Regions:
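Bacterial N-terminal signal peptides
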Residues: 8-18
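Residues at the start of alpha-helices and the adjacent loop-to-helix junctions
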Residues: 5-10, 99
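N-terminal secretory signal peptides that target proteins for export/translocation
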Residues: 1-3
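Aromatic- and Gly/Pro-enriched helix-to-coil junctions and flexible linker segments
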Residues: 19-144
Length: 144
């Protein structure tokens, strides 16, 4: 005769097995370095009308988000610098959830759902901005 709790254990195991595919589909996507390097990294260096480049305020700053300083004469980062920037940017995102990722909320206008506490410029007037969408794609696990 099985112990009294055996039925509960079997039922719990069956429920866990049934939920496993759903739980797996909700797993956070991995952030892709190659997508970051090709599509996200240029955004940090890009001059936008009426705004300074992200790089200007965030190069080795005391901000929560800092970027590597460009080497003298360089127009972009080295591989090593890019990997450090990737790690730094990754800290400020919740993979799979652009709406709660600081990297996307800080430069977004408050009227569009951005964080009102960002002291820097509002790079994106809305979530329809092509560069905001690129950042969101990266956070959602987009790959090249």
């Amino acid at each position: 005769m099985a112990p009294r709790g055996a039925g509960f254990v079997v039922m719990a195991a069956l429920l866990a097995a049934a939920a496993a595919p759903q739980m797996a589909s909700r797993a956070a996507p991995a952030l892709d370095y190659e997508f970051f390097k090709a599509r996200v990294r240029p955004i940090f260096l890009q001059k936008r009308d009426g705004h300074t480049r992200c790089y200007v305020c965030h190069a080795e700053s005391n901000n929560a988000f800092w970027l590597e300083r460009l080497s003298p004469g360089a127009s972009t980062w080295s591989e090593e610098q890019s990997r450090r920037n990737f790690q730094m940017a990754s800290i400020l995102v919740n993979p799979g959830d652009p709406a709660t990722s600081r990297l996307l909320q800080q430069p977004l206008a408050p009227e569009a759902g951005g964080n009102v506490f960002h002291s820097g410029g509002r790079q994106f007037a809305s979530k329809d901005d092509p560069n905001w969408k690129i950042l969101a794609d990266w956070v959602n696990g987009q790959k090249l």
